[in-house]
Amino acid sequence: MELNDAVMGRRSIRAFLADPVPRDKILKIAEIARWAPSWGNTQPWEIVVADGEKTQRLADAFAEERGRGTTPKPDIAIPIDFPEAHKGRYVALGRELFTAMGIERGDTDARGRHYLNMSRFFGAPAVVYFTIDGSLNEPYACLDIGSIGTTFCYAAHQEGLGTIYLAASMHYPDIAKQVLDIPADKKVVIGIAIGYPHPSAPAALFRSQREPVENILRFA
């Protein structure tokens, strides 16, 4: 697969098949992703893969916490506000996704089911967690996690797998640390759900838009 095809073809998958992802395939993807650039070649990432029974335990526990209305307590703060232009894109994404899924604006039950499904990783059979040492400078370390995480997504796409950066996967890091034996002094930065995309579900076929290059780039 050409790089252009991987970059342009990847999309965020929100409906997965239950078929397990072979561990050797995840290892193959990680072998590629580990070559991602990092500040000073520090490679601050540690990768923990939840699959099989561990994924199910996490999904059940996260969904239970969401059902209780438990406030998320992520190790890395999730943005709650944006500049107007960014907020517009965020709102548009939700509107376009729900339209593609056939969820009406006032259908709070359907929206609630979607968010609960999100806490269950959209049915993905595995979640790849990226953690950092708690003593690290967060901005630089998180930049590096974005580097390896995105490379991981492209490599997964090349292998016929779908992925999604999933903030819901790090809403309750204490649970993730307990289930996955992650030391308390580590910070869970993000989880990437991975699996085989559902071939017909609108949530798996949906693709978000991007700004034209002239809107984001200028020559000084």
Annotate each PLM feature.
Residues 1-220:
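Acidic, surface-exposed loops and disordered segments
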